[in-house]
Amino acid sequence: MADAEMENKMGTENEYGADQIQILEGLEAVRKRPGMYIGSTSARGLHHLVYEIVDNAVDEALAGYCKNIEVTINPDNSITVEDDGRGIPVGMNHKAGKSALEVVYTVLHAGGKFGGGGYKVSGGLHGVGASVVNALSTKLSVEVYKDGQIYSQSYKIGKPDEPVKVIGKCSAEKHGTKVTFHPDPTIFEETVYDYDTLKQRLRETAFLTKGLRIVLSDARVDPVHTHEFHYAGGIKEFVTYLNKSKEALYPEVIYCEGTRDGVYVEVAMQHNDSYNDATYSFVNNIITPEGGTHLAGFRNALTKTFNTYARANKILK
């Protein structure tokens, strides 16, 4: 190829002008760059899909409306998450011109957790997590149990098959949301879920949400493999669990809780014979591995309390 022709071709390929700026509509951006939304397309990202849906159910529990969450790995490696919360709203969202349920599952940055009315505490974001899971699934179906009716909508690669419709009746007492999704094998490196990975995460979630019952079932095996997590003691039981292979220096877990300026705080601790620090901090049930002012404040207060006691009892000069 002549030098002039080569230079002309390279110039065209490297051209960067106004027309090279792409506009990705709807959930297209999620499929184009999934790592921006779920971290990766490896096994870690695959399991993150489950956490996104579960976190939405947990937020209902944190708001005081959900007591039970059931997570099932189906025989075809799809996932079903069902909760007994209030159920995602199904009425018409007048701004979007469609059902609120469809908005939640098809529009990024749409949900009930951006303002102060729907949720005072939340770890997930309806309309971010839910719509991302939908975008990265070949199929997703959602059922909402509300006001004695069962509402349903199904999607393929993030797009609704038809508008939200009523598919049946349920008891007036039944309420909640049931979601089933099939991860897209063209997006993820693997689509086989690891039971132990989900078990570890769901156990931790149950510890952090006092009184919440979470059931994990693996329907890929016969008989179905099931674990139930329910901890009335919450993070007190979490500390006991973390210390089970160590020798505690005193029998009772120290626990305190309180609210100041509208912020609720729980602390549980129990020293053991290890020299390694094992302090875990969470905000709205989401672990904060890098710490933050909440952890720094706790450590400062703990140090100050120990020093004050030690000086008062002439242990520390």
Task: Please give the residue ranges for each predicted region.
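A conserved short beta-strand within the histidine kinase catalytic ATPase domain
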Residues: 67-73
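GHKL/Histidine-kinase-like ATPase module
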Residues: 163-166, 196, 203-205, 211, ...
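Bergerat-fold GHKL ATPase/HATPase_c domain
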Residues: 2-54, 103-105
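Conserved ATP-binding N-box helix of the HATPase_c
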Residues: 44-67, 129-136
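Flexible beta-alpha connector loops of hexameric P-loop NTPases
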Residues: 37-44, 89-95, 188, 287-290
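Flexible hinge/switch segments at interdomain interfaces of large molecular machines
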Residues: 23-31, 74-75, 170-180, 269-283
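Short, conserved non-catalytic motifs in the polymerase core
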Residues: 38-40, 118-120, 125, 279-289
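GHKL-type ATPase core
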Residues: 2-19, 77-100, 111-241
